[in-house]
């Protein structure tokens, strides 16, 4: 694989992340009846560049009592994992067409927990540690439902390859037959990416800023980039799983445009939810998963396992 292929994937993601921060501030601004950033450049379009320059030229401070290696390694690992999650995403062709693309995404998003845990522990601050423990418990819990929902979708798809979902959804989007799963999936992705109303890791009133409270300048920017890259990736995955774009081999650009539009709409929904809903209480967050989502997803998964045998049908194979 050539280096140019990897760069062609990474650079657009980082640019998208930069402008997503601007979009979020604009949307929140308009929802709160104010303008949002509008000074730097026309309509505030250069604001992300100004933010990046400011963050990366500041001195990265490190607490004297922190663990130097882990403290530096955690943000690097977070961004590396966030970018590697994009490898099997078909847009319409993935960087590497993995046979078990879905399992790769699950495994990589599970590894992201370590970067949060390391950053909280290495900071040697009680606020950071409590924030990290909350984030880890939340991420691991919601990964359970994500895995079961993915298993149900793969039963319908007949394969663990993400590219096959395009073929499966040629005639009908999977959101129509699987709408309960789609709703639970969307709420679980909000919790998985630590977004409002599940942003308990960043409870300003209790934890100052959560697991990244001791970070400043460059390392903080890396965490920030990782979080937003994960948001876009999760929405792209939602679009692929439930709103499959039609792929015409003669015009692959149409598929890409279609996918980008759907991802953008879903990302706007994330921001809309942030502007509209207050934060959950921690026990409510856990009850929602273990007492509501888990039994329901397990029941639906058992139904999807038994349906082909019951109705003597077979899942669509390539």
Curated annotation (Swiss-Prot):
<dbReference type="InterPro" id="IPR001694">
    <property type="entry name" value="NADH_UbQ_OxRdtase_su1/FPO"/>
</dbReference>
<feature type="transmembrane region" description="Helical">
    <location>
        <begin position="3"/>
        <end position="23"/>
    </location>
</feature>
<dbReference type="GO" id="GO:0009060">
    <property type="term" value="P:aerobic respiration"/>
</dbReference>
<feature type="transmembrane region" description="Helical">
    <location>
        <begin position="223"/>
        <end position="243"/>
    </location>
</feature>
<dbReference type="Pfam" id="PF00146">
    <property type="entry name" value="NADHdh"/>
</dbReference>
<comment type="similarity">
    <text>Belongs to the complex I subunit 1 family.</text>
</comment>
<keyword id="KW-0679">Respiratory chain</keyword>
<feature type="transmembrane region" description="Helical">
    <location>
        <begin position="253"/>
        <end position="273"/>
    </location>
</feature>
<keyword id="KW-0249">Electron transport</keyword>
<feature type="transmembrane region" description="Helical">
    <location>
        <begin position="171"/>
        <end position="191"/>
    </location>
</feature>
<dbReference type="InterPro" id="IPR018086">
    <property type="entry name" value="NADH_UbQ_OxRdtase_su1_CS"/>
</dbReference>
<keyword id="KW-0813">Transport</keyword>
<keyword id="KW-0999">Mitochondrion inner membrane</keyword>
<keyword id="KW-1133">Transmembrane helix</keyword>
<comment type="function">
    <text>Core subunit of the mitochondrial membrane respiratory chain NADH dehydrogenase (Complex I) that is believed to belong to the minimal assembly required for catalysis. Complex I functions in the transfer of electrons from NADH to the respiratory chain. The immediate electron acceptor for the enzyme is believed to be ubiquinone.</text>
</comment>
<dbReference type="GO" id="GO:0008137">
    <property type="term" value="F:NADH dehydrogenase (ubiquinone) activity"/>
</dbReference>
<feature type="transmembrane region" description="Helical">
    <location>
        <begin position="37"/>
        <end position="57"/>
    </location>
</feature>
<feature type="transmembrane region" description="Helical">
    <location>
        <begin position="69"/>
        <end position="89"/>
    </location>
</feature>
<keyword id="KW-0520">NAD</keyword>
<feature type="transmembrane region" description="Helical">
    <location>
        <begin position="293"/>
        <end position="313"/>
    </location>
</feature>
<dbReference type="GO" id="GO:0005743">
    <property type="term" value="C:mitochondrial inner membrane"/>
</dbReference>
<feature type="transmembrane region" description="Helical">
    <location>
        <begin position="100"/>
        <end position="120"/>
    </location>
</feature>
<keyword id="KW-0830">Ubiquinone</keyword>
<keyword id="KW-0812">Transmembrane</keyword>
<keyword id="KW-0472">Membrane</keyword>
<protein>
    <recommendedName>
        <fullName>NADH-ubiquinone oxidoreductase chain 1</fullName>
        <ecNumber>7.1.1.2</ecNumber>
    </recommendedName>
</protein>
<feature type="transmembrane region" description="Helical">
    <location>
        <begin position="135"/>
        <end position="155"/>
    </location>
</feature>
<keyword id="KW-1278">Translocase</keyword>
<keyword id="KW-0496">Mitochondrion</keyword>
């Amino acid at each position: 694989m050539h280096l140019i292929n990897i760069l062609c994937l990474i650079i657009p993601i980082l640019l998208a992340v930069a402008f997503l921060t601007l979009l979020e501030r604009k949307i929140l601004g308009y929802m709160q009846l104010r303008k949002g950033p509008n000074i730097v450049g026309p309509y505030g379009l250069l604001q992300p560049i100004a933010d990046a320059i400011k963050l990366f030229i500041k001195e990265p401070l490190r607490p004297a009592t922190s663990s130097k290696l882990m403290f530096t390694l955690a943000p690097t690992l977070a961004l590396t994992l966030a970018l590697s999650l994009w490898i099997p995403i078909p847009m319409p062709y993935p960087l590497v067409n993995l046979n078990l693309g879905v399992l790769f995404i699950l495994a990589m998003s599970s590894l992201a927990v370590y970067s949060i845990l390391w950053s909280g522990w290495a900071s040697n601050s009680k606020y950071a540690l409590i924030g990290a423990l909350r984030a880890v418990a939340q991420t691991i819990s919601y990964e359970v439902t994500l895995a079961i929902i993915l298993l149900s979708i793969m039963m319908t798809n007949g394969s663990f390859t993400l590219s096959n979902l395009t073929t499966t959804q040629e005639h009908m989007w999977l959101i129509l037959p699987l709408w309960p799963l789609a709703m639970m999936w969307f709420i679980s992705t909000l919790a998985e990416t630590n977004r409002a109303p599940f942003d308990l890791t960043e409870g300003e009133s209790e934890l100052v800023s959560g697991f990244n409270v001791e970070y400043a300048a460059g390392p903080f920017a890396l965490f920030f980039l990782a979080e937003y890259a994960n948001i876009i990736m999760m929405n792209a995955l939602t679009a692929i799983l439930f709103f499959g774009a039609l792929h015409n081999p003669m015009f692959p650009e149409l598929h890409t445009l279609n996918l980008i539009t759907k991802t953008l709409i879903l990302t706007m929904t994330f921001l809309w939810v942030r502007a509209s809903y207050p934060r959950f209480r921690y026990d409510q967050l856990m009850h929602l998963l273990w007492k509501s989502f888990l039994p329901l997803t397990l029941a639906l998964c058992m139904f999807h396992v038994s349906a082909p045998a019951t109705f003597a049908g077979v899942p669509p194979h390539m």
